[in-house]
Amino acid sequence: AKIAIGYRMDEIKNEITGKTKACFEPALDYVVVKFPKWPFDKFVYATRKLGTQMKATGEVMAIGRNFEQALMKAVRGAEISHDCLADVHMRALDDEALTAKILAQDDERIFAVYEALFRGFSIEKIHQLTLIDEWFLAKLLHLCDLEKRLETEPLTHDFLRELKRNGFPDKTIARLSGNSAFPHLPYSYKMVDTCGAEFAAETPYFYSTTDEEDEASAFIAEHSSKKPVVIVFGSGPIRIGQGIEFDYASVHCVWALKDAGYEVVIVNNNPETVSTDFNTADRLYFEPLTPEDVGDIIRVENPVGAVVAFGGQTAIRLTKWLSENNIPILGTPADSIDAAEDRGRFEALLKQLHIKQPVGDTVHTAEEAIETANRLGYPVLLRPSYVLGGQNMIIAFSDADVKEYMDIILSHMEGNLVLIDKYMMGTELEVDAICDGEDVLLPGIMEHIDRAGIHSGDSIAVYPAWNLSPAKTAKLVDYSTRLALALNTKGLINIQYVICQDQVYVIEVNPRSSRTVPYLSKVTGIPMVDIATRVMLGEKLKDMPYGTGLAPISSYTAIKVPVFSFEKLSGLDTQLGPEMKSTGEVLGIAPTMREALYKGLVGAGYQLTDKGGIFITVRDTDKDEIPDIAQRFADLGFHLYATAGTAAVLRDHGMSVTLVHKISESEHNTIALLESGKVNYIISTSKKGRTPARDSVKVRRKSVELGIPCLTSLDTAVALADILKSGFTPDTAELVDICTLQK
């Protein structure tokens, strides 16, 4: 930016050293590895092959004294259920299948290459197969040799230090050697300085290694401010379900802690975030968020407390270890977090509070799941415990669905239970609240346009809720207050509800920051993270100027609309459900709900037109509702196209509709219709559609290729028809200054 306005490089100071200029050639005594984070653990049917189109949702960065150390850090920091490059699935393949995997050019290729080297494939052969530079292959072979030695050699002090120097964590060493009776060799910390230690760096930005010199300890001793230290754990790589919203919360927490007079340390490994800017916190450690990797940071920093509430599930997973090692956790205690996640404890709490929840149970096996599903009655909702973004969460309609989904869930989970609930179709609402142990502040209640069954991150959310009666509002405030207090919450809590047959049920409670905190903070003007941080430090809500209970409702409407990246993941079904698929969101603000929704949809990339054709094909359970929706589009002048079953229903209701054949029935089929340019919108729902072979999935994938808006939620279709009827255009939509509105 400075160069753009006329500065020369010899006039710009290097902020890291504080002494050299930007023209000074960097000299690095460390190696950096960037490792992508792919979404294939969530999207098991998406095409994994990598090419020129980006498929990663995020990345981690790792720094080490050598390539091996940095690579091993990156692998375990990517949160892909690997603590090294050895992969049990690759080890089970024969040589022919392994060679095919190497040639596949997908996200698992590095593990296949490592396994081939471990088996004795030559570097030359793998280079011929992959064109990966032999330097990298030699480094992987070095790690293979160390793994083989682990299986046969005793763990002497020198060998242990060699392993640690090449990135092997204690957990991996113990597993591969079968020996856990060895001492932990503490990490030391080196400073990132860009000048090979020629000058003393001024930016406290550290990475771990096994050198004897500990530059972090020396820096702390030299620059001690005598302020108490707090460590904030970040959220790791951006992935679907855990995005930049959590970094927003982490950074605002850092600022609030600084304002309160604390020295703040950030631990994170995501180079895309503000939290890992070297000047955000007082000190930054670029490290994986695992117990071993953070343990020595805690030893060096000696904090008065640690913050896990703003780092998503990545930070929450550290809670148990922190508690067991007597590290003070600022905010909601570890036991309360467990009480919200443990099915038995949470059910007992709700019974004690006389609050309803959907009936359900916990299971360990596919057999138990099928038995439970039949007892509850289909459809049922399955999800692993302790997940974020609805990963591997699905609605099952049959025993076959349960069997298929349990196989997927059990292959990805790490020893947690699977929860099964009776699926309840109703209005879903969401509350973010702040509790200080005595009082509760609710900045707002959000209502989803899409009914329960679609993940909250993929639903269109509206603030303020527009369908709530005063009685229901009072009940939500009462339930939220009692839940927050009963869980001994100190800070933020997120609660999701469903209203079904006029009854309020609790779906989920998360005593931590959520992905809606930035949205609600900005549209209400209430600095939720700042307040929550102050509460975690012991301040009381009644001593702050924001009040308690439900905050005053705004006079404007703010709508959060999800953004999807379906065009980047071929083979992925676009039908929405309980597993989150969106990669971002936009905000529409206006005096009315319709105008706010119009702005949100346009901002999310929808190509809106008020005339043309609409193709409709829906599952049997939606055929009672589809006539009213189709009539709305017909009244706007849209020509209706539909497959046989849907067309019959629409004709029975007196509508004119063109019959379209399924893909397998004729060459004049749905795909041909979409390619003809006659269709401007698609409404497509199907009972089961995860596998790409089904007609419904092919239709939805074709819509992505052609850029035709495809609605898989009937509620979104109704909302779309309403805003098309309103006739908003970019010229007529009102420009809104939210700061003025808040006044």
What are these regions (language model features)?
Residues A74, M191-I355, H364-E371, I589-T740:
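ATP-binding N-terminal substructure of ATP-dependent carboxylate-amine bond-forming enzymes
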Residues A1-R149, E153-F159, L163-G167, E222-P228, ...:
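ATP-dependent carboxylate activation and anion-phosphoryl transfer catalytic cores
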